Regions:
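A structural "flexibility-hinge" signal
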Residues: 1-182
Length: 182
């Protein structure tokens, strides 16, 4: 995160806060999109693309370190955000900006970096778990966001459950609105 912070000209705390806000917003929008067959089919098709096979995760250290954020990653992220947020990515960037204190441009760049990482992670999970249908991808996203039937929190849910109350949803809403739960 240090390199990404330097590349944006922002401090690490703001960059970390922006990533913490961006990831659940992206995952939540993807989960929402999978509630209809068209959205689920579109996401499954995108995850079949070699570009989203998980290989980006091998470069995560250098991407977050700032040395590998190139125009290709930003362009891929921009395209992903357009699909995931249905053209409303400025609203999402505003929420990330409000949560992190970053300016809109920096918040948008964080979203553009986070989106291909999320897609790479999902693509890798899809292949490893042999997910072939909309129910499977919805279950995967639900598990990541804490919507699974399991009693134990998923790893990402534990990370995203900022107040430790067992519910990620209130934390995601708080992240999106820039407020903290009292």
């Amino acid at each position: 995160i240090n390199g990404t912070s330097k590349q944006l000209g922002k401090n690490e705390q703001q960059t970390t806060s922006a990533l913490t806000a961006a990831l659940p917003l992206i995952l939540g929008a993807m989960k929402n999109n999978t509630t209809n067959k068209t959205g689920a089919t579109g996401l499954l098709g995108a995850l079949d693309n070699q570009q989203h096979d998980g290989s980006i995760l091998d470069n995560l250290g250098s991407i977050l370190g700032g040395s590998s954020i190139d125009d290709k990653i930003l362009a891929d992220g921009d395209g992903i955000l357009g699909h995931v947020f249905n053209g409303k990515q400025q609203n999402v960037a505003h929420a990330v900006s409000a949560k992190s204190g970053l300016d809109m441009s920096s918040a948008m760049n964080i979203l553009k970096v986070a989106a291909p990482i999320v897609m790479g992670f999902l693509g890798k999970e899809k292949r490893q778990k042999n997910i072939q249908d909309s129910n499977g991808i919805g279950d995967l996203l639900g598990g990541l966001l804490g919507g699974s039937a399991k009693n134990e929190q998923s790893m990402i849910e534990k990370i995203l459950d900022a107040d430790g109350d067992g519910s990620v949803i209130d934390d995601i809403i708080g992240m999106a609105s820039g407020s903290k739960k009292k």
